[in-house]
């Protein structure tokens, strides 16, 4: 259909953030019509600040680029003091954005196939509905009921889950940074750890991990062949086994 995409890389410093110079350059291209954002960011786990969202809004609005913000991990903020700001809540983004959310990541109900889009602008909402017709399935009754229950009746469970995941994240962070050749930054959010394995000096870091009996998500899927992603949304016993294998 003639469409194409360009990837905006994340920039590593004290934390990961977007390469705003690259975003500004790509948005200035008249062919650019849509910026797809992931916030919290997957796989690096950063939560964008209001200043960063304001910069995104400035770039998108100046170039008439729509924003589609995937915020499926927004209820998995692990770092104390960090706050998720929905793109559609920002006045300078509301009329130019589509915000995608679901209970599936936080409450483990992905199999029910239920998500939702928040689109304040009526014209944009109608265009989204028209484009989705015949492609995107309607939600099921069970999925709708489960989503409502998750967001209205599970606060105590959710808080316990965040505590558990925070402990798992810290375990991964402390262990990985003590394994020769591996390093990582502490994720603000999600149940995913982005591991820099460039220090191993091996040709294939995925093979290195698999030979130790660990099957992480390949970094090449995220344009970083010398990295891999670990899911720490599991039992502590399983996570300890994973980390022991990597350290062996």
Role assignments for model-derived ranges:
Residues 60, 176-177, 209:
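A generic structural signal for well-ordered alpha-helical segments
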Residues 56, 87, 205:
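Aromatic/hydrophobic pocket-lining residues that form π-stacking "cages" and hydrophobic walls in ligand
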Residues 148, 164-173, 183-196, 223-226:
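Conserved glycine-rich beta-strand-loop-beta hairpin in the small C-terminal domain of fold type I
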Residues 1-5:
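Substrate-binding/gating loop at the entrance of the active-site cleft, primarily
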Residues 89-90, 95-166:
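Conserved core segment of the aminotransferase class I/II
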Residues 10-82:
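Active-site phosphate-binding strand-loop segment of PLP-dependent enzymes
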Residues 25, 207-217, 222-248:
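PLP-dependent enzyme catalytic core of the Aspartate aminotransferase-like
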